[in-house]
Amino acid sequence: MKKHKNIMIQGTGSSVGKTLIVAGLCRIFAQDGYRVSPFKSQNMALNSFVDIEGLELSRGTVIQAEAGYEIPRAFMNPILLKPNSDNNSQVIINGKVAYTADAKNYFSHSKELKYLLHLDEFHSLLFHRH
């Protein structure tokens, strides 16, 4: 099995252009013949998109997937936080609403959510097909 390669894009804060840079890289690599898929383990976004299975993911991840000629899927964005107010967010796990929590309560679940925050070598994202 050919080993996949990963690239991580990091920024200094919110709204600094990470999503746009990743979308551009997805398009460039896809046009060069590589199969690319975005993966953002956790995202905070007010608006979301519903994929072909009826599951939610962030619109930014959708733009990145489409830039790479991939079908947007919720497993590309396993944890989505949708703010309800200044104090709490709806927590969406694998595309489904799980619960609403403030920051303290969300972090109390962090051990349960940790498995979602990385890709292992057999993750479905690495092997899915159109």
What is each PLM-predicted segment?
Residues M1-H130:
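Flexible phosphate-sensing "switch/lid" loops adjacent to ATP/NTP-binding sites
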